[in-house]
């Protein structure tokens, strides 16, 4: 008797299932890369010294490049967070750190911004947390 019940339920389930399912949607792919060569420095017309294509009638941010600020202040990867810090503790941490008040465009400019904000030092830190910079080093182009 149990066999007949199970067979009836199975047969009913087979009849209740639809026979034609819609096909899956086609896969989406990323667009192909451009077939032309991109110009250097983002716009091809800048000269990187602030006197080129920026500010006033230009096409950049004052240095002829894209909005990267001209040069890399901090190395890519772990030490990529620019900070202005007051005190270094054994080379492991820096105290009283904050993001620079203006965007620096090179190492000496980064130092002058930090000095103007209370005599702080320009640093590149791994993990800035609540005014504490963990594992910091000097930025590119500074001593």
Curated annotation (Swiss-Prot):
Could you tell me which residues belong to the region Disordered?
20-67
Give the CDD domains listed for this entry.
Answer: hydrophobin_II
Q: List the disulfide bonds.
A: 74-124, 85-97, 125-136
| Entry annotated with the keyword Chaperone | no
Subcellular location field:
Secreted, Cell wall; Secreted
A cellular component term from Gene Ontology for this protein is: extracellular region
So which domain of life are we looking at?
Eukaryota
- Give the matching InterPro entries: Cerato-ulmin_hydrophobin, Hydrophobin_sf
User: What conditions trigger expression of this protein?
Assistant: Expression is induced by carbon starvation.
Q: Whereabouts are the sequence repeats? A: 41-42, 43-44, 47-48, 49-50, 51-52, 53-54, 55-56, 59-60, 61-62, 63-64
Summarize subunit and interaction data from the UniProt record for this chain: Homotetramer. Further self-assembles to form highly ordered films at water-air interfaces through intermolecular interactions.
Q: Which family does it belong to?
A: Belongs to the cerato-ulmin hydrophobin family.
**Name by which UniProt lists this protein:** Class II hydrophobin qid3
